[in-house]
Regions:
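Electron-transfer interface patches adjacent to heme c in soluble/periplasmic c-type cytochromes
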Residues: 21-32, 44-52, 63-180, 189, ...
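N-terminal export/targeting leaders of redox proteins
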Residues: 1-35
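Acidic/His-rich structured neighborhood in mature extracellular/periplasmic domains
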Residues: 185
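Hydrophobic face of amphipathic alpha-helices that form TPR/SEL1-like repeat modules
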Residues: 39-40
């Protein structure tokens, strides 16, 4: 009997060692806050029913946005807005369509606890990460502390700050490295000219002026999303949204 107990003990130790080695091997490439944030960006346990992640709506192949008018959250529930891109978000003055977040860190946690999106209290999200062997190990390795709301937001922020578009064809054209096709040049002229007037709002190197605009769709009836007004409570902000 004693021999069986000893063998069982050593078998358990061996199994734990193998599992630990597996996790270490799997995560040798995750050494930075940004790398951890990238992994968390696709992590579904951060939603109430573990069905959606940040990447469910911020889809990489669609410029970290999606292709529908209203994005879907937990349980397939439609949200009230579509998903903005998270590209080129570094050093923006505010975030979300209505500017309700002042920093990337503040922005990062809001979708998790939004009942229409991921529907999970931040306290529960942190609890799940602490109960998850792999994530607990990664947070301790990178932040030198267990998962908490602050370092969770920091990881997301670090990842999102890496999502900069610096090598597009337009960038190359701006730096005299490539020529635009005739069709692309016509599009550029339309974009910056007085006919379409896109450039009035979509200017600067990231094609945004970081301002709020009302393009005339809000009517307070069937189109009743008041946008910035919901945050500022100023009548002049009715129907205004951040320039993407």
């Amino acid at each position: 009997m004693m021999k069986k107990i000893i063998l069982s003990f050593f078998a358990a130790v061996l199994l734990i060692t193998v599992i630990s080695s597996f996790f270490e091997k799997e995560n040798t490439g995750i050494k930075t806050k940004a790398a951890l944030g990238k992994k968390l960006f696709s992590e579904k346990i951060l939603s109430k029913d573990s069905s959606v992640s940040c990447a469910s709506c911020h889809i990489p192949q669609f410029a970290f946005a999606d292709t529908v008018a209203f994005s879907k959250g937990i349980g397939g529930k439609l949200t009230t807005r579509n998903t903005p891109s998270v590209l080129n978000m570094k050093n923006r003055p505010y975030y979300f369509w209505d500017g309700r977040a002042a920093t990337l860190e503040e922005q990062a946690l809001m979708p998790i606890e939004n009942p229409d999106e991921m529907g999970l209290a931040i306290e529960e999200a942190v609890k799940r990460l602490n109960e998850h062997r792999e994530y607990k190990m990664l947070f301790n390795k990178i932040f030198k502390e267990q998962p908490n709301a602050k370092n969770l937001a920091a990881a997301f922020s670090a990842f999102e700050q890496t999502l900069e578009t610096v090598d597009s064809k337009f960038d190359d054209w701006s730096n005299n490295l490539k020529e635009l096709t005739a069709q692309e040049e016509r599009g550029r002229e339309l974009f910056v000219g007085d006919k379409a007037k896109c450039f009035d709002c979509h200017r600067m190197e990231d094609f945004t002026n970081d301002e709020f605009k009302n393009i005339g769709l809000y009517n307070g009836k069937e189109l009743n999303d008041a946008g910035l007004f919901n945050i500022s409570k100023k009548e002049t902000d009715l129907g205004k949204f951040k320039t993407p």
